Amino acid sequence: MALTGTDRVKRGMAEMQKGGVIMDVVNAEQAKIAEAAGAVAVMALERVPADIRAAGGVARMADPTVVEEVMNAVSIPVMAKVRIGHYVEARVLEALGVDYIDESEVLTPADEEFHIDKRQFTVPFVCGCRDLGEAARRIAEGASMLRTKGEPGTGNIVEAVRHMRKVNAQIRKVVSMSEDELVAEAKQLGAPVEVLREIKRIGRLPVVNFAAGGVATPADAALMMHLGADGVFVGSGIFKSENPEKYARAIVEATTHYEDYELIAHLSKGLGGAMRGIDVATLLPEHRMQERGW
C-alpha cells in the first residue's frame, strides 16, 4: 500500500510557498532564470499554457525527461501538471519525486466525472477553483493548495480577479452563517459541510490560495496580492514576454512589495512588451479552460 502524507504535513509544505511566485518553465535554462529571479518554485511542463492553447489537440502530462531535467537544474521545489482525474499520471510524477502535483485544467481532462483522490498520495496537490464550491470539493479530496483558475494562456487577469473576489466573498458569507444556514449553503454549493464548518471556525480557507491564470505584469501580481492571494503563479506571462529575466525579477519583487507603488512603478519601467494576450470575451465556451473540472 502506498504511503500517504498527512493533511497537516502536506498543507504545511504548501504554506512554505506563501508570499512567493511560482513560474512555469519548459527546460533547465528557464528553470535557472526563474530560480535566479527569486521564484519559490517552478512548474515543469513541455509547453506553457499559451502554446497549449495555440496548438489545440490533447494536452497530457509532460515527458518525464523534461521534468527530471528541471529537477536536476534547480534547488527550489518542482511542480508538474497532470490531467484532471488521471491518477496514473500522478503516480508517475510521484515516483519521479516531484515536490507538488497540479491537477490542472490546462491539460485535457482524462475523467469527466471524478477528480483524483489526492488523500491517497504522499505528494501534496494543488488544484484550481473559481468559487467556494469548487474550493471545498478539492479540499475534501485532499488538495493541499488552491489557485484561481483564471483563464490560462491569455495574459488577461480579469478571470483571476473574478475568481479571487468570488471565493473571498463567499468565505465572508459562510463565516457569518448559523449552523442551519451552513447546511443549506453546503447543499447549494455542492460542498462538504465539514469543510464549510472548518472555514467558518478559522475564518478562511484551511489551505493557501494562490492567484493564477492571466498574470502578465508586475502590476497584475500586486493586484492579486491586494485581493487576498497568498502568492502568484505565472504561466505564459514571463517567457512569452520580450525580456523574461526582467519580467521574472519584477514580478517577484512586486509580489513581495505589493503595497509599495513607487517600487512597482520603477519595476514596470523598460521591461519591454508583455505577452500579447487574448481578450477572454472573444473565446468560445469550448475554448475556456476554466470550465474544465467540476
Curated annotation (Swiss-Prot):
Residues the entry annotates as binding D-glyceraldehyde 3-phosphate: R165
The organism's taxonomic lineage, starting at the top: Bacteria, Bacillati, Bacillota, Bacilli, Bacillales
Species whose genome carries this gene: Geobacillus thermodenitrificans (strain NG80-2)
Free-text function comment from the UniProt entry: Catalyzes the formation of pyridoxal 5'-phosphate from ribose 5-phosphate (RBP), glyceraldehyde 3-phosphate (G3P) and ammonia. The ammonia is provided by the PdxT subunit. Can also use ribulose 5-phosphate and dihydroxyacetone phosphate as substrates, resulting from enzyme-catalyzed isomerization of RBP and G3P, respectively.
Protein name, UniProt field: Pyridoxal 5'-phosphate synthase subunit PdxS
EC number of the protein: 4.3.3.6
Enzyme class: lyase
Taxonomy, superkingdom: Bacteria
Residues the entry annotates as binding D-ribose 5-phosphate: D24, G153, G214, G235, S236
A GO term, aspect molecular function: pyridoxal 5'-phosphate synthase (glutamine hydrolysing) activity
Subunit structure: In the presence of PdxT, forms a dodecamer of heterodimers.
Alphabetical list of PANTHER family matching this protein: PYRIDOXAL 5'-PHOSPHATE SYNTHASE SUBUNIT SNZ1-RELATED
Catalysed reactions listed for this entry: aldehydo-D-ribose 5-phosphate + D-glyceraldehyde 3-phosphate + L-glutamine = pyridoxal 5'-phosphate + L-glutamate + phosphate + 3 H2O + H(+)
One of the protein's GO biological processes: amino acid metabolic process
UniProt keyword Lyase, yes or no: yes
